[in-house]
From Swiss-Prot:
Gene Ontology CC, one term: extracellular region
Single GO BP term: proteolysis
InterPro entries on file: NLP_P60_dom, Papain-like_cys_pep_sf, PG_Endopeptidase_C40
Active site: 125 (nucleophile), 173 (proton acceptor), 185
Family: Belongs to the peptidase C40 family.
Keyword entries, A-Z: Hydrolase, Protease, Secreted, Signal, Thiol protease
Protein's UniProt name: Probable endopeptidase Cgl2188
PROSITE patterns named among the record's database cross-references: NLPC_P60 (PS51935)
Amino acid sequence: MGKHRRNNSNATRKAVAASAVALGATAAIASPAQAAEVVVPGTGISVDIAGIETTPGLNNVPGIDQWIPSLSSQAAPTAYAAVIDAPAAQAAPAASTGQAIVDAARTKIGSPYGWGATGPNAFDCSGLTSWAYSQVGKSIPRTSQAQAAQGTPVAYSDLQAGDIVAFYSGATHVGIYSGHGTVIHALNSSTPLSEHSLDYMPFHSAVRF
């Protein structure tokens, strides 16, 4: 009976040793590097196996530090949940100065025309343009002819929102170009402040301040 136990013990040790050698062979093929001691638990068997510490996924094997004592001194890998940061919301671009002028003028659409009026409740043509520009901190000449003469000339094809457009011979009327071929202006006492096509009146010139 005792002899039978010895035989079983010898067989177990041989099987364990074979497992260790097989593990070592796998590691050696995967990554030839510095040798680490591999101990077969419950036996006196230990072998040095090159590269075993770098075997992919080795640290995830339960109880592996009993086989490879050097792994017990290494920090266990930390599992991180995959986190995908949502893209930060893009801030809306700040309105250009020209667009801010248009926006100010547009708030007065429907206001009555008043000769010599500069707002905020009634306007004449150059009174509207002067008032709208003042809302963005810009001071421009008061009369339509002075505005047309003192700004930087702009070609019809290069008009941008906020430019001042003059109409009729002698630039006797002005309005604010609002984009897309339209102008906001205070036309006359029979027409409240409105937005019309540039073709509504004969074009004279355009300027930018």
